[in-house]
Amino acid sequence: MRLCDKDIERYLDEGIISLTPRPSNEKISGATIDVRLGNSFRVFREHSTPYIDLSGPREEMTAQLNRVMSDEILIADDEAFFLHPGELALATTLESVKLPANIVGWLDGRSSLARLGLMVHVTAHRIDPGWEGKIVLEFFNAGKLPLALRPNMAIGALSFEILSGYAEHPYNARKDAKYKNQQSAVFSRIDKDE
């Protein structure tokens, strides 16, 4: 069952779901709550790596990822990050999200931004039960013009769904949770897959 606006507000008030800083109740509508863009970004560097072998030796994959991904880029609140057509970048939400073991979250982009070519998640829009941390956004500009993205702008909307029970292995309790408590735009940790 998806939570409606009044239940989202109640779950936030009761601390069952936590968003920090908490968006105002005016950001709750129908079945979602708006989230804003944070200050942490990462991009692909100019590189000569011909490809990343996603099933190759871990050490080689780690070295390839380190060669192609930038260090964290911090954008001040009064500055803009420019995403050019055909580019992929990582960023975070301003809000840190904490979910209990019986609720899954879903991140959706905003229609107004999608109509300009901005995808806020390439495929990964599920927020696992037991998640705690900022949400990493996988931006892609499918449009024809560069887009100026500014910290604190409304970037997406979260909805929440109650599971049939409590997950036995919620995300942050798992030893193999690769993005546990993330607070910045962490790049792919596919090299940590078992």
Curated annotation (Swiss-Prot):
Keywords: Hydrolase, Nucleotide metabolism, Nucleotide-binding. DCTP binds at R110, S111, S112, L113, A114, R115, D128, V136, L137, E138, Y171, K178, Q182. The active site is at E138 (proton donor/acceptor). The keyword Hydrolase applies. Pathway: Pyrimidine metabolism; dUMP biosynthesis; dUMP from dCTP (dUTP route): step 1/2. One of its GO terms (molecular function) is dCTP deaminase activity. Belongs to the dCTP deaminase family. Gene3D superfamilies: 2.70.40.10. Its EC number is 3.5.4.13. Catalyzes the deamination of dCTP to dUTP. The keyword Iron-sulfur does not apply. Signal peptide: none annotated. HAMAP family: dCTP_deaminase (MF_00146). GO terms for biological process: dUMP biosynthetic process; dUTP biosynthetic process; nucleobase-containing small molecule interconversion. It catalyses: dCTP + H2O + H(+) = dUTP + NH4(+). It is an enzyme of class 3 (hydrolase). CDD domains: trimeric_dUTPase. This is dCTP deaminase. Homotrimer. It comes from Glaesserella parasuis serovar 5 (strain SH0165) (Haemophilus parasuis).
